[in-house]
Amino acid sequence: MGFGDITNVTTGEARLSYVHLFKPYAHQPGAEEKFSCTILVPKSDTATKARIDAAIEAAKQKGISGKWNGVCPPIVPTPVHDGDGVRPSDGMPFGPECKGHWVFTANTSVDYPPEVVDQNGNPMINQSEMYSGVYALVNVEFFPYMFGGKKGIGCSLGPVKKVRDGEALGGSAPTAAQAFGVPQPAQQPAQGATPWGPGQPAVNPITGLPM
């Protein structure tokens, strides 16, 4: 398996959520930490969806001839879900950002950190440039698995290329400018103003009220 294989897909422009590209993350306590991100592919991008469908079918055939010992399950769990439907984990609707998208999560082990590049293809230096809500191209690999007697198709995370910024999704830490506004130039105290002293009440810098 690898680049050039039909199971390997590079998406069109997609939105990223739950971005953990530089530091591995465990979604549940005690679980294995992995690099990962959730990928939102617009349903209007039928070309990417067709490549994904073909990759999943090819991965099923690899499973039949390999790990699945010649038998394909009647229903094969796949990682791609309808963002207009409900989450398979809890039956609740996907978030509003998923509407009109195909949704899937790709991950890779701590031994294989994904290569992350900027719009020019250069290694991403500023890690804050990749956040939940950014738009990117993502290379993924679909593969068959058999774990604990369960068979299915998984999705491995490969290189990621930022395309453009987008509105940060919930769960992303706001910047200082977003939280407090653009900083204003420091103003000098008026001529003759009484300097701060221990006898004066402290003022809350956010509300302007005495503390």
Language model features by range: what are they?
Residues 1-5, 167-211:
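Acidic, gly/ser/pro-rich intrinsically disordered tails
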Residues 1-105:
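OB-fold ssDNA-binding interfaces and closely related basic DNA-contact patches used
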Residues 41-43, 142-144, 164:
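Beta-strand elements of well-folded, non-transmembrane domains
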Residues 87-88, 118, 126, 204:
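Acidic surface patches and DE-rich sequence motifs
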Residues 105-119:
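Short, basic/aromatic beta-hairpin or loop at an interaction surface
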Residues 115-136, 143-153:
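Exposed beta-sheet edge/beta-hairpin loop segments within beta-rich domains
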Residues 147-167:
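OB-fold/S1-family single-stranded nucleic acid-binding modules
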